[in-house]
Every structure is written in structure tokens, then in C-alpha cells.
Amino acid sequence: MKILVSDEIEKVCPSFVGAHVEVSVRNTPYSEGLWNEINRLEQLFRATLTTETLKDISGISATRRVYRACGKDPSRYRPAAEALIRRMLQGKELYQISTLVDLVNLASIKFGYSIGGFDAEKFEGDTLTLGIGKAGEPYEGIGRGLINIEGLPVYRDSRGGVGTPTSDNERTKINLNTTHLLVLINGYDGNEESVRANAEFLIRLACDFCEGHDASYYIYR
């Protein structure tokens, strides 16, 4: 899959760096080992963060800045990494969906980047373009119904929007039959070293908990 970054994104975030990750996998409903890792990280967050200081995490802070630059209120449409960590800090259970979805969430909260996790076989066309949502653009968020993506960074395939930092799209979501995982890591803070580390961590999780193989990633701008 080819990834293009539009001029409108370059204008609001010239330092943007992303990682495209692909892995062949076998999904399962639940992994105890993975949830042990998630629970350990949750304990660390509760000991070191508050719902205010989590906004200072580099990836979260940068994504919030881009939302504002695009005209979106980041407190109303929270980046997914922030929303997940905030949920932990409020003492709420993190959503348990499936092993693939859960490991993408773990990779996101560990590094603070909003990450899109997709079933690669559900895309239309061979190119994803990162742009900004338009007024009235149709978009069905996973478990959210139709959402207003005007002013949100959005990846589009040849049919339309598939992923934003707030919510991915129902059309390309992961399910238990997913065998070809595609992940997009969004480094709005421009920290290539951290984005690479996030990609490598995610691949490790996929190999450890979803029989991952034929894994690869590349950096894009």
C-alpha cells in the first residue's frame, strides 16, 4: 500500500512522520499474556500521570495542536491515545475487543501516538492519502455511527475515509477473520526515532500474541 501525505497536512504539520506496518497474523478473541502487559502499563500510568498531565505526552500534545490548526476541538474529539489513557486514569475498564485490536491499543497508549489498525484486504485501491476531513463528508466511526470529520486528519482510500486519530471506519475495521494487518502510526510530533520504536514494538506484539510473520514497516512523510 502506498501512503501519500497531502499538502494540507504538510501545511499544518510540516514535521509529520508516519510509519506503515504490515503483518500476517491470526486473530483470537482474547490473550491473557497481552492483557498482563496492558495491566502493567495501566499501573504505571496511574502512578505517574493525571488526566491533565497526559496531555503533555509528546505524541498526544502534537496531535491536539494539529486538531486546533485544522479547526477541531481536541477536548470534544479526543485523539484515541489520549481517550484510552484518560479512561484508564478514571478507573474505567479498557475495552477488550480482540487480540489484534487490543494490541494496537497497547501500542498506541505506550507511545502516545494515535494508531490506525486495519484489515488490509478491505481497502479499495492501492493508495491511502492523508488529508483533512470536509464538511458533510460521510464517515462511520467504529461503534460511533456517523461522525463529523470536518477538520480531522483523515486517511482516504479510493472510496473514502478509512481512519482518523479519533476513530477508524467500520468499513475497514479488524475482525476475528483478519489475517492481513495494516497499521498506520501518526507521529505529529515529528519524532522519527519514537515512531520507529512504536512500529517495532507493535510488530513484536503481533509476533508474540497473534502468530505474526512476514512483518515489515517503512517511514513516510
Model-derived regions: residue spans:
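Charge-biased, low-complexity intrinsically disordered regions
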Residues: 1-221
